[in-house]
Amino acid sequence: MRKIEEQMNMAIRSRKNWSGSNTTVRCFKENGVTTEVNVLLHGNCIAWFDTASNDFNISSAGWETVTTKSRLNAILEEFAPDRRVFQKNWQ
C-alpha cells in the first residue's frame, strides 16, 4: 500500500479532513458528530462512509484507472479485507 493510501485510511478511521496530492478525505458533521466521510480522487467521489451504520460504498466514478483501483483496493484492504477491485479484459 502506498504512503498516501495509508494516510488516507488513517484520515477515514479518525474521521478527520485530509488532503494529499490528488486524494481528499472530507468529513461531514451534524450536531458536532461526524455522520459521513467521503473520499475524493481528482474531485470525484470514489467512496462514502455512513458512520452511523458503518456501511460504505465505492465507485470508480467513471475513471477505471490504475490509480482509482489502487485507492479503492487500499480502502477495501482496510475496511473489507476479503474484497478486491480488479479489471479483466478492460471490463
Regions inferred by a protein language model and the residue ranges of each:
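Terminal leader/tail segments of proteins
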Residues: 1-91
